[in-house]
Amino acid sequence: MGEFNEKKATCGTVCLKYLLFTYNCCFWLAGLAVMAVGIWTLALKSDYISLLASSTYLATAYILVVAGVVVMVTGVLGCCATFKERRNLLRLYFILLLIIFLLEIIAGILAYVYYQQLNTELKENLKDTMIKRYHQSGHEGVTNAVDKLQQEFHCCGSNNSRDWRDSEWIRSGEADSRVVPDSCCKTVVTGCGKREHASNIYKVEGGCITKLESFIQEHLRVIGAVGIGIACVQVFGMIFTCCLYRSLKLEHY
């Protein structure tokens, strides 16, 4: 009877080992995906960060990159701990899983909170940023971001093209008789911003605020979904690890 129980325990341990190994392979790929989403946000979608008053959007992307790297390292460690049957490595693996779980939950919560606050932040700060920093020395990032925003989303001004009348760049005379930046034009040519007409200038209801808000909210949904989704999957990893740890402990007695 004792021999049967021993074989049963050994069989259970082997099953858990292969289950955890399969999980770690999938987990490593998930880490790659998490890191890719973070890098994608930073590298391709960071042009508009200079237009945001809060650094929350940037922080969520950095958290995902860090979490992705740690996930990939943890996945390799998990495979080693599983096949070497080292309980101390399993303990370390569990702790790392817990840390990653918390990081991704934090990223998901930050994305959700910022999602709720985004509209208020843009209404309070975007117009001020555009009219005070556009084409001003030391704010080249804002200038490039505004030009790209207006061209990519076919909008002009924070709320509408009339916002540019309050621009320090326009009022200072440096705009060379322009009433709006050239990036407001449907067909951009040098000096096209001197003529504010519907046939020439983008007239979008809600202005660039609504366009930028929709853009960022879409990416916040991706960041939040990835963070929370992978965190939920990690719960299974922690359960498998605890089961294998307990199984190895029983075999030593």
Curated annotation (Swiss-Prot):
GO process annotations (BP): cell migration; positive regulation of cell migration; positive regulation of endocytosis; T cell proliferation; wound healing, spreading of cells
Post-translational modification: Palmitoylated. Palmitoylation by ZDHHC2 regulates CD151 expression, association with other tetraspanin family proteins and function in cell adhesion.
Subcellular location(s) of the protein: Cell membrane
Annotated glycan sites: 159
PROSITE patterns assigned: TM4_1
InterPro entries (alphabetical): Tetraspanin/Peripherin, Tetraspanin_animals, Tetraspanin_CS, Tetraspanin_EC2_sf
Keywords: Cell membrane, Glycoprotein, Lipoprotein, Membrane, Palmitate, Transmembrane, Transmembrane helix, Ubl conjugation
Gene Ontology cellular-component terms listed: basement membrane; cell surface; plasma membrane
Membrane-spanning ranges: 19-39, 58-78, 92-112, 222-242
Topology in the lipid bilayer: Multi-pass membrane protein
Any one GO molecular function term: integrin binding
Lipidation (S-palmitoyl cysteine): 11, 15, 242-243
Subunit organization: Interacts with integrins ITGA3:ITGB1, ITGA5:ITGB1, ITGA3:ITGB1 and ITGA6:ITGB4 and with CD9 and CD181. Interacts (via the second extracellular domain) with integrin ITGAV:ITGB3. Interacts with ITGA3; this interaction modulates ITGA3 glycosylation pattern. Interacts with F11R. Interacts with RAC1 and CDC42; these interactions mediate physical association of RAC1 and CDC42 with integrin adhesion receptor complexes.
Stated role: Structural component of specialized membrane microdomains known as tetraspanin-enriched microdomains (TERMs), which act as platforms for receptor clustering and signaling. Plays a role in various cellular and molecular mechanism through its association with both integrin and non-integrin proteins. These interactions facilitate critical cellular functions, including cell-to-cell communication, wound healing, platelet aggregation, trafficking, cell motility, and angiogenesis.
Name the UniProt record assigns to this protein: CD151 antigen
Lineage, highest ranks first: Eukaryota, Metazoa, Chordata, Craniata, Vertebrata
Gene for this chain: Cd151
